[in-house]
């Protein structure tokens, strides 16, 4: 079939398998160009199919020559209907890993469930024995709690007062004002249950109980802080409470791994175009201004550049891992530079529908968004008849 982007709001309903494959190849080429990283050799990535999780898997495999197991929840293709991009990404990743002689297997299912944890445990026992590095990179709006059976939904809302600020429809470029009502009832509790650290902790406990964690094993989860302008809806909102919980969980996991010399860290990453961030009001406008500044300064990074820097300059330098005063690894350091934030804050005040094409990088935003779904890559023949029915080789 001829596959074209079909949009509904901030979601693209189609994905292009050849474009997703090109995306993987581009990321692998970048990692290889930066040279070998003396890092983990047996890596589990929970949330391995898109964004930072996918980039972590690529960096582990093609930077460190690691064997990788990836867990994700993606939709395979059906006749005439494309798969989700993460499915095509994972299929392409496994193919490239196989060509390079690297072990790569995947599990498709709900990572919050006991069943998927058990499947993963069985696979590690059978194939790898133990794990050196566990990356936890889940972004889900819902979580079916494995113990209580309750379905929890996360919300992106401010706490205490309505938040009003600018936002942009990144398809049309229209800048408008948006008001978001504050959370109520169980909103905070539900958001913490979905996006906090409980499931991360459950994964580590399950792996440790089965003796699947190597000595000095490391686990990393990802977080975001961001600027003042997004604070009310992000870091000081419901999602911020979940991130606080995630960050606190790193310390309790580290305590539980003391007998193995293991450590848990949260890495604070930069703002990037992902399916998750596109859904958050205010963030797309901030990102389009941030991109403009960071590109002009020569310090712009995508997911793969961020993960390469995390591995090569933070995790695996041979020295102690540098952290901030709250024990977090910071690779949002270039985004949060005072000069960058000052410039973004100034542009924020000037941003209108008319000025944004000039002062922001809406084109860069749109391009990155299309790339998430396998569209807009050089060297891909988008007018060609494409087979949507692609398998992930390790998943029957």
UniProtKB/Swiss-Prot annotation:
Transmembrane domains' residue ranges: none
Catalytic activity, as annotated: a 2,3-saturated acyl-[ACP] + NAD(+) = a (2E)-enoyl-[ACP] + NADH + H(+)
Keyword Transit peptide belongs to the record: no
Residues that bind substrate: 224
Single GO term (MF): enoyl-[acyl-carrier-protein] reductase (NADH) activity
Keywords: Fatty acid biosynthesis, Fatty acid metabolism, Lipid biosynthesis, Lipid metabolism, NAD, Oxidoreductase
One Pfam family recorded for the sequence: Eno-Rase_NADH_b
Pathway per the UniProt entry: Lipid metabolism; fatty acid biosynthesis
Domain of life: Bacteria
The keyword NAD appears for this protein: yes
Positions annotated to bind NAD(+): 47-52, 73-74, 110-111, 138-139, 243, 272-274
Cross-referenced InterPro entries: Eno_Rdtase_FAD-bd_dom (IPR024906), Enoyl-CoA_Rdtase_cat_dom (IPR024910), FabV-like_NADH_b (IPR050048), Trans-2-enoyl-CoA_reductase (IPR010758)
Record-linked Gene3D superfamilies: NAD(P)-binding Rossmann-like Domain
Active site as annotated: 234
Enzyme Commission number(s) from the entry: 1.3.1.9
Residues at the site labelled Plays an important role in discriminating NADH against NADPH: 74
Class of enzymatic activity (EC top level): oxidoreductase
GO biological process annotation, one example: fatty acid biosynthetic process
HAMAP family per record: FabV_reductase (MF_01838)
Entry function: Involved in the final reduction of the elongation cycle of fatty acid synthesis (FAS II). Catalyzes the reduction of a carbon-carbon double bond in an enoyl moiety that is covalently linked to an acyl carrier protein (ACP).
Subunit text: Monomer.
Homology family: Belongs to the TER reductase family.
Name of the protein this chain belongs to: Enoyl-[acyl-carrier-protein] reductase [NADH]
Natural source organism: Flavobacterium psychrophilum (strain ATCC 49511 / DSM 21280 / CIP 103535 / JIP02/86)
């Amino acid at each position: 079939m001829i596959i074209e982007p079909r949009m509904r709001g901030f979601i693209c309903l189609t994905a292009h398998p050849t474009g997703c494959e090109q995306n993987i190849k581009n990321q692998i080429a970048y990692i290889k160009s930066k040279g070998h990283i003396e890092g983990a050799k047996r890596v589990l990535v929970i949330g391995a199919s898109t964004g930072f999780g996918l980039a972590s898997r690529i960096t582990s495999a093609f930077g460190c020559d690691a064997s990788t197991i990836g867990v994700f929840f993606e939709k395979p293709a059906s006749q005439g209907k494309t798969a989700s991009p993460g499915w095509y990404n994972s299929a392409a990743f496994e193919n490239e890993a196989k060509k390079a002689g690297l072990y790569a297997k995947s599990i498709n299912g709900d990572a919050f469930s006991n069943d998927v944890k058990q499947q993963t445990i069985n696979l590690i026992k059978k194939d790898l024995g133990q794990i050196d590095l566990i990356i936890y990179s889940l972004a889900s709006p819902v979580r079916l709690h494995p113990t209580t059976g309750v379905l929890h939904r996360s919300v992106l809302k401010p706490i205490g007062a309505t938040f009003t600020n600018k936002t942009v429809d990144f398809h049309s470029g229209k800048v408008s004002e948006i008001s978001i009502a504050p959370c109520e009832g169980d909103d905070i509790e539900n958001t913490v249950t979905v996006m906090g650290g409980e499931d991360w902790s459950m994964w580590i406990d399950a792996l440790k109980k089965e003796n699947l964690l190597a000595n000095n094993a490391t686990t990393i989860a990802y977080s975001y802080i961001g600027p003042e302008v997004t604070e009310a809806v992000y870091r000081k909102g419901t999602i911020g409470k979940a991130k606080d919980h995630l960050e606190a969980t790193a310390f309790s996991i580290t305590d539980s791994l003391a007998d193995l010399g293991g450590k848990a860290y949260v890495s604070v990453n930069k703002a990037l175009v992902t399916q998750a961030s596109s859904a958050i009001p205010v963030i797309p406008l901030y990102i389009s201004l941030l991109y403009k500044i960071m590109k002009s300064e020569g310090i712009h990074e995508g997911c793969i550049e961020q993960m390469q820097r995390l591995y090569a300059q933070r995790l695996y330098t041979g020295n102690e891992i540098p952290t901030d005063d709250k024990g977090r690894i910071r690779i949002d350091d270039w985004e949060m530079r005072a000069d960058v934030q000052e410039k973004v804050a100034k542009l924020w005040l000037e941003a209108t529908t008319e000025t944004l094409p000039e002062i922001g990088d809406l084109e860069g935003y749109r391009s990155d968004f299309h790339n998430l779904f396998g569209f807009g890559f050089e060297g891909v023949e988008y007018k060609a008849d494409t087979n949507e029915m692609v398998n992930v080789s390790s998943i029957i």
